[in-house]
Amino acid sequence: MADGGPTPQQSANRPDAPRAPAGVGLIALLSAMVMVGQASTSLYVPSLPSLGAALGADPTRVKLTMTAYLLAFALGQLVYGPISDRYGRRPTVLGGIAFYTLATLACAVAPSIDALIAARAFQGFGAAAGVSISRAVVRDRFERADAARVLSYVGMALSVSPALGPIVGGQLQVWGGWRAAFAAQVTLGAAIAAWTFVALAESLRAPDPAATRPSRLLRNYRTLATSRPFVVSVVLNGAIFAGLFGYVTAVPFVFIEIFAVRPDVFSTIFLFTVAGYFIGTAVASRLQRWGGERLIGTGTLVALGGGALMLLPPLLGLTHPAVIVLAMMVFLIGFGLVVPNAIASAMAPFPTMAGTASALFGFAQTALASLGSVAVAATYDGTVRPMAATVFGAGLVTVIAHWGFARPQAARA
């Protein structure tokens, strides 16, 4: 995608602080802030089948605990972004993580599936602060190429969470049942809140007192919604995340119920799957000289290939767990190439409203991504096909978005 340059007003208002190289400490802290949200899905995934049995809920109701979380996660970003433009990144993210920790405690003691669905929604709202503010902090401190590199490093670090989360979650399930997974998240939330309080410096140089006024919000959102690079980036990330969320929602049922894999063994399988994400983000961080456009284009084709590899065997009546793992590894290599570069492309033109841009980007991306979870929950029929079709469809949309809309614009630029 071609990045539009800042407007004269944006250039005039741009903070003149130097964009210093990111240290390991900052990358680790940003990763931890985002990890709050990831852990809330990966830690409890192995417990989904037993959770339903314990609370007397069918698989469709159980999957709503994921959907409610994702939708609230999307809406929460719309709140935190403008607030952070007005009051600063630090107080906003601290408040959000504290809210997350309390909501997670409510999840751990939920007496029914309805109470758990509601608590998961509040948990998602709190977790939204970490991911929304982390993008704004990166935009505050770094220009386009450096931002993509930092986001790639964060992605490499975050690949540990979906890899180890299900393994830890599987052991927690064996040891203490589904409530143990949420108890672990309470501890994680409190620890990250303390770390953020100690280590995160304010990165917003010029707070905007009008950032939360309705007229300013509408004007800013209109500016973002009419920016073609921004919109295409949202569609790219939303589609590729839809494939991931569809997979995460369905895969415990596919492996544990269809293939009769034990929860602790299933969680180990995630190590191989998430290796693709690590590879993709590692390549993206090392090959920024290729340019974001080329990396995104390559990533969309790789993701489509992974989706095709997952869908074709079940259509032919040939289903094997190893093929599913290999296909998702390929898909996640493409994911790792697309995501950091698409985020950087979306945020680059808007230095003076980074919080609001991050908010709308995250909301739209997560709302689109939740469609993957909804699609799988609505169509699950006890086979691999709904999950595979969702992953393939996600890859196809990314190819259309980039090669059909972003690529022609870049050629004209």
Model segments located where?
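Helix-breaking motifs and short loop linkers at transmembrane-helix boundaries and internal kinks
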Residues: 54-56, 88, 109-115, 126, ...
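Conserved MFS/SLC helix-loop-helix module at the cytosolic interface between two early adjacent transmembrane helices
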Residues: 75-114
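Helix-to-loop junctions at the C-terminal end of transmembrane segments
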Residues: 77-87, 280-293
